[in-house]
Amino acid sequence: MASIIFLDSPVCSGFSYARDPKGCDVGDYSSSLQVQRFLNKWFTHHPQYLSNPFYLGGDSYAGKVIPLIATYISQGTEKREQPLINLKGYLVGNPITDPKFDRNFRVQGAHGFGIISDQIYEAAMKNCKGNYVIPENQLCAEVLETVDSLISEIADGHVLYKKCVVATPKPIDDATRRKFLLEESIKPNEAPGRPTVDCFTYGYYLAYFWMNNKMTRDALGIKGGTVSEWVRCKKELPYTQDMPSSIPYHLNLTKRGYRALVYSGDHDLQVPHLSTQAWIRSLNFSIVDDWRAWHLGGQAADLPSHMRTI
């Protein structure tokens, strides 16, 4: 049996809050330290779980900071700081990692899916010479603008899904946000746009009303007067993306014996699986289990590859 902690991070996302508004102004490094402090406090109050193997996990942007959080925890363990968290490893899914990989492989991925033509792909290779992050000439900039325009026509999070309304309310102003910190009311401020039932975002739409329901909040133990309205994505949070790459943290952790599970959906163009495979190869690990199919119920379910440090 496994126990799972679902954490709203960074502070001021989800149902988390800060007594001082400055506490919401964080970035990759500071938010990761916040998570470490939370875990230290949680294990201090629940010492019966300290002996359990502990794994961190996160998808998408959370996948970028998970190795950093794991590094902070491992450093605390090496210094024998209490509580001693029994960290064994981490898992990340479709993780944002490094723009040199994540952005560059969008072009190759779009070509593989047939979203851009051979001619556009060849023009991109010729004029950008493999650098699709910051165009170095006008011809490269123009072809990348064409690529981005074509990708914008689809749901790049899953290229087989229809493009739907993103079920997130419009950003609220600072005055309204401050008012939320003082109110006990859970009356929704502004419902998100309603997608059609066949859209994958319809679940996000329903979640907005479910999470703002009083029975749900009571069941979750949400403290009254803290967060008046739950919003799935708070785009207006003052978050600084100050860690350029998480690759050094992946390398450091795995070389020190921590286990890592990196998984990636093959229809994601926001973080293409090609980019994930590329940065993993850059770690120069030896392959211990060749690329193969694994089966579930007699059907090929996926094609995993296992690696280990040299």
Question: What positions do the PLM features span?
Answer:
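Terminal and linker regions of secretory-pathway proteins
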Residues: M1-I310
